[in-house]
Each structure stands twice: as C-alpha cells, then as structure tokens.
Amino acid sequence: MDNDRQKALDTVIKNMEKSFGKGAVMKLGDNKGRRVSSVSSGSVTLDNALGVGGYPKGRIIEIYGPESSGKTTVALHAIAEVQKNGGVAAFIDAEHALDPVYAEALGVDIDNLYLSQPDHGEQGLEIAEAFVRSGAVDIVVVDSVAALTPKAEIEGEMGDTHVGLQARLMSQALRKLSGAISKSNTTAIFINQIREKVGVMFGNPETTPGGRALKFYSSVRLEVRRAEQLKQGQEIVGNRTKIKVVKNKVAPPFRVAEVDIMYGQGISKEGEVIDLGVENDIVDKSGAWYSYNGDRMGQGKENVKTYLKENPQVKEEIDRKLREKLGIFDGDVDEKEEDAPQTLFVEE
C-alpha cells in the first residue's frame, strides 16, 4: 500500500478509535495465537468432547434434549465448578422447577447462587442481560427457553394464537446479548426442550422452540439423551446418558461423551474415571476385575465405584493423569489455527 493510502487509513482508524474506543478496529493477525478461556463442565468426559477443556467463556451454549434426559443436571455441574473456583453464578428458573436439595447434592453452593423466577419471558431475558452487563457474573443459566413465555401470551386469553412471538423475542434478546456476553467473558447456557414438527414424513421431525436465532448464536450446542437405564438388582438407580456436541465453533464437533447420571447424585465422577481410565490404559481391566498400579480395586464396575468413593485420593490421581494425557487443563487453552475451524452449523 502506498504512503498516501496508508496515511488516510491510519487517520480513519484513529477517528474510529476516538469515537468508539480503543480496539474498535484491529488487524486479524493481532489476535493470532489468542487463548480460549474455558470453564470445566464438571465432567472430564464432557470436557474432552468439548475440545477446549470445558465450556468456552464469553460464548453462548445451548443444551437441549427430551424430558428428564439430564439437561439441568449438566448445567448445574457447570455452576458447581464455577463456584468451586471462586466464580459467581446466576440461574434464571423460567420453569419454576429448580430443586435446591438436588442442586446442593451436585455441589452447588445454594447460599451463593443468584436465582430468579421471572413472571414472563421478557423479564427473564432482561434479568439475564443485567447479570451479563454487570461483568460480575461468570456463568448465567436460563432454564428453559421453552418456558420463556412472552408477556402478551400470558396476558391474553387461553386459546389465542401468537404466531412467532417467542421466536421474535429470542431473536431480539440474542442480538442484544451476544456482544455483551463476549465483552464480559460470561458463559451463558440456555437449556431447551424438544418439539415435534407436524406433518414431517421424511427426515428428523424434532425441533427446538424459540426459533432459529439460538442455533445461530450458539458457539456450542449439546444434545443430551438417555441411552439406557442403570440398575442395581431390580432397582433403577440412574441413566447412562449420551451427550453429543452437534455444533462447536471452538473445536471439532460431533464428539460424543457418555456419562452415568445417578438419581439424587448427578454425574458419577467415579464412573467416568473408570471408563476413561480403561480406554486410555491408566486403569487395567481383566475380565470383571479392575486394577490400578497393580492393586486390585474391585470386581464389577459398581464395586469399583464404591472403592473410589471410599478412596477419593485414588480417584483424584486417576483424574489428574487422565487430564494430563488428554490435554485437558482448567482455565486458558491455546487456540491454534488448525484447532479452530470456521463456523460450523448443523440444522436439526
């Protein structure tokens, strides 16, 4: 570029920085090798599937799936991890269904969790925006998008039709929220439900409420589904749950994490340490017996879970070795060009 054009460009950039603040315009190469900050999901298996050691900060995450599949459980584990590291968490309970006893069992510090149960969708999203813009909250969870009922629908008569009202509400809210979430480095998790499209003969009839905006604005989308029931004798004690990363802007997508969600306890940390330990040759399995460093831990997975609960130092040691081997570290993760693909979007 010749000197005259460069001078003109420098003048324009100076004027823009004067009007809009420093950093309003920059060269893309200035951000080369930047670091993607992340917050652990509370599950080493899911952290590995997400590719950057957890949920990326300053991004929007959508967690969706059928009823009772474990969506809220997954989000509550993330809140517990943030609080464990001294962060601040807020929960927008649009469904008015959060169980504080269960949340506490998952490790959530309920005395320091900011909770809002809004009267209508606009109120819930305004509260979420206020938390984000404060810059003082590390994670905001909205449970759920489907329950963010527009004010006009609540005040109207039963049976009134409000075509596209919720979709317009979400679209407007996300336009306002996305920039603020990025600047404040807040992790925003939106939990969503599943609906069936009427009259679909071919292809997947499932869709998520709230229009397409959330699909576009989300950096990560997780599909949570029950795979099978877990039993002790005849008693059902939990579910084997598949969490599929269907969209990921910060790492390769389509990875799948399988975790055990136990009733009243949440994700079984012992269960995933056993599974990943065997998979990565840290835990030895011979028949039904499991061993670590030559010492037998037990026969059968449930007995080994009990052993690890009684010997937490062994569990922590295996967990640490797993994170080292898989390259999962808390906090900042280097984002190299080859690890950061272009925007990927999957239509359900």
UniProtKB/Swiss-Prot annotation:
GO molecular function: ATP binding; ATP hydrolysis activity; ATP-dependent DNA damage sensor activity; damaged DNA binding; single-stranded DNA binding
Top-level taxonomic group: Bacteria
InterPro entries with a match to the protein in the record: AAA+_ATPase, DNA_recomb/repair_RecA, DNA_recomb/repair_RecA_CS, P-loop_NTPase, RecA-like_C, RecA-like_N, RecA_ATP-bd, RecA_C_sf
Coiled-coil ranges per UniProt: none
Residues of the signal peptide: none
SUPFAM superfamilies reported for this sequence: P-loop containing nucleoside triphosphate hydrolases (SSF52540), RecA protein, C-terminal domain (SSF54752)
Keyword field: ATP-binding, Cytoplasm, DNA damage, DNA recombination, DNA repair, DNA-binding, Nucleotide-binding, SOS response
A cellular component term, taken from the record's GO annotations: cytosol
One Pfam family cited in the UniProt record for this chain: RecA_C
Entry's localization field: Cytoplasm
Chief localisation class: cytoplasm
Residues where ATP binds: 65-72
Segments traversing the membrane: none
GO biological process assignments: DNA recombination; DNA repair; SOS response
Family as reported in the entry's similarity comment: Belongs to the RecA family.
Role: Can catalyze the hydrolysis of ATP in the presence of single-stranded DNA, the ATP-dependent uptake of single-stranded DNA by duplex DNA, and the ATP-dependent hybridization of homologous single-stranded DNAs. It interacts with LexA causing its activation and leading to its autocatalytic cleavage.
PANTHER family, A to Z: MITOCHONDRIAL DNA REPAIR PROTEIN RECA HOMOLOG-RELATED, RECA
Protein name: Protein RecA
Organism: Staphylococcus haemolyticus (strain JCSC1435)
Gene: recA
